[in-house]
């Protein structure tokens, strides 16, 4: 694959022998912020002792929320790509897809809070470790980090997650449907053609309430990013197994960070026509090792899934070498491999 400039420029300061690296873009962004001055806070409209909001009718608030949400539901009832699961892999996939303004992307996340396990590092600690060369993705989205020889450390995992979400959700071709569950797949012949959706609270209470039918979202491509096994994990591949479209889901093996991250990126693929698997769900379907609290493979697996989706849509992508947008050397796309698994 093609490579951009090798070394990323940075400014550094001493921190107990460790360099603090901030991407050049981040430096420019901070440089544009206006310096705080007394005049900024002395303006009458910012007088906190006499602060007054403009009046509004309660019904206007209700209409604005309802109209906009329902419009998005109508818009994405038939969409290009549905990403199921808004963890670090799903968000990275959606971010990469959203660079093409003509690709309509819907993200489904059953939690009220997107981000999956990427709000914290391991064992509820706050730092996030990312092995090189995946740190170049952090440079692109302007997340600062401490740089060591073979890896970088973000001081708090939430810095990555909040940054990528704010950049992604600002794009007009992306909609996040959080508190929404994917209850099932739409299958036509041998192809996944969309997802069956419901409010997450409804999906979790089918046993306590009378029958509550779902909704649907058709898609040209479904990206399953449902994480590793658990009450709500690996749901995409487990459903494929239950209907006989794949033979087995052996589950991930014991932890091996070095083997796990390479394997997850390499084997991110279209497992059946119309459905791409990314992130830790790849380890579940392949029986490859779990990686523990390192996150680089989640980001790059998500990027690879995006390019697989672009390829499936017949659009320029890095796998075919015809991608014209900004591509970074961290995209290890293994384009010589067979991208569709045999069921």
Swiss-Prot record:
Q: Which family does it belong to?
A: Belongs to the THI4 family.
Q: Which Gene3D superfamilies match?
A: 6.10.250.2840, FAD/NAD(P)-binding domain
What the protein does?
Answer: Involved in biosynthesis of the thiamine precursor thiazole. Catalyzes the conversion of NAD and glycine to adenosine diphosphate 5-(2-hydroxyethyl)-4-methylthiazole-2-carboxylic acid (ADT), an adenylated thiazole intermediate. The reaction includes an iron-dependent sulfide transfer from a conserved cysteine residue of the protein to a thiazole intermediate. The enzyme can only undergo a single turnover, which suggests it is a suicide enzyme. May have additional roles in adaptation to various stress conditions and in DNA damage tolerance.
Task: Show the catalytic activity.
Answer: [ADP-thiazole synthase]-L-cysteine + glycine + NAD(+) = [ADP-thiazole synthase]-dehydroalanine + ADP-5-ethyl-4-methylthiazole-2-carboxylate + nicotinamide + 3 H2O + 2 H(+)
Q: Which cofactor does it need?
A: Fe cation
Primary location class: plastid
Q: Which gene is the coding source of this polypeptide chain?
A: THI1-4
- Any idea which residues bear 2,3-didehydroalanine (Cys) here? 211
Name of the protein in question = Thiamine thiazole synthase 4, chloroplastic
How it assembles, according to the record, is: Homooctamer.
What's a Gene Ontology MF term here? iron ion binding
Binding-site residues for substrate, renumbered to this chain: 89, 109-110, 117, 182, 213, 228, 280, 290-292
The subcellular localization recorded is: Plastid, Chloroplast
């Amino acid at each position: 694959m093609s490579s951009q400039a090798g070394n990323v420029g940075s400014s550094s300061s001493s921190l107990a022998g460790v360099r603090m690296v901030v991407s050049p873009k981040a430096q420019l962004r901070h440089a544009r912020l206006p310096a705080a001055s007394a005049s900024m806070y002395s303006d009458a409209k910012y007088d906190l002792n006499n602060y007054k909001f403009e009046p509004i009718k309660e019904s206007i608030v209700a209409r604005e929320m309802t109209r906009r949400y329902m419009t998005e539901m109508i818009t994405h009832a038939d969409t290009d790509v549905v990403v199921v699961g808004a963890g670090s892999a799903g968000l990275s996939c959606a971010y990469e897809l959203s660079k093409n303004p003509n690709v309509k992307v819907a993200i489904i996340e059953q939690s009220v809070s997107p981000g999956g396990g990427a709000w914290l590092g391991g064992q509820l600690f706050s730092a996030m470790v990312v092995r090189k060369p995946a740190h170049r993705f952090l440079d692109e989205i302007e997340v600062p980090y401490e740089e060591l020889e073979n890896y970088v450390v973000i001081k708090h995992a939430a810095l990555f997650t909040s940054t990528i979400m704010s950049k992604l959700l600002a794009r007009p071709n992306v909609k996040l449907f959080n508190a929404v569950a994917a209850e099932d797949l739409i299958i036509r012949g041998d192809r996944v053609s969309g997802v069956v959706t419901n409010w997450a609270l409804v999906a979790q209470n089918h046993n306590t309430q009378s029958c509550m039918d779902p909704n649907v979202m058709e898609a040209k491509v479904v990206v399953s990013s449902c994480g590793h096994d658990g009450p709500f994990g690996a749901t995409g591949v487990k459903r494929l197994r239950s209907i006989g479209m794949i033979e087995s889901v052996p589950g991930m093996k014991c932890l091996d960070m070095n083997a796990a991250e390479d394997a997850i990126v390499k084997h991110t693929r279209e497992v059946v026509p119309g459905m791409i698997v990314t992130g830790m769900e790849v380890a579940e379907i392949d029986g490859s090792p779990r990686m523990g609290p390192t996150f680089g493979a989640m980001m790059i697996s998500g990027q690879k899934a995006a390019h697989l989706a672009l390829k499936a849509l017949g659009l320029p992508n890095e796998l075919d070498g015809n991608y014209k947008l900004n591509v970074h050397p961290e995209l290890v796309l293994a384009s010589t491999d067979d991208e569709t698994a045999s069921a």
